[in-house]
Amino acid sequence: MLKQIKSDIYHLLHPKMAFFLTSVSKNDKPNVMTCAWATPVSEEPPVVIVCVSKESYTAELIKQTKEFVINIPTKKLLGALWICGKISGRDTDKFKRAGLKIIKAKKVKSPVIDGCVGHIECKVWKTVDAGECYAFFGNVISAYADEKYMRNGLWTKEAEIPLHLGGARIVYFR
């Protein structure tokens, strides 16, 4: 029997890939948050959407600089995913707290996270007010991945990409 869902409807769309969303301030101060709300919306031109809470420091920075990077981790970075999802970067250096090393991105000022197996650099072309979140539409400026974890353009199971199941549950496939 099907049960009517009245709250947390988005859980029906899980699992979703858990990733690091990096941004930067106008003064070049880097920031990172854990995110799972992203989706491609166009192949040509390549466009992705990330949805971020309006009250977050990350949303503030993305609105200021109009750019972000999606950094795709493996299970080796699960601890850092938890840390970056629990605290604000407004007053804390989450990179230091989580033991993450940053690398200069290829095309944007927002940083890339070392140890991630994929990166999607984006420039925001549209922001939509979507309830408690902003939906940032990002034109993909550059995308690259560790080829040892890709086969025919798809992730292999060896990449062990974390999946967010909803709430505080994250798993990965082997």
Placement of each model-derived feature along the sequence:
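Basic, polyanion-binding surface patches
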Residues: 1-174
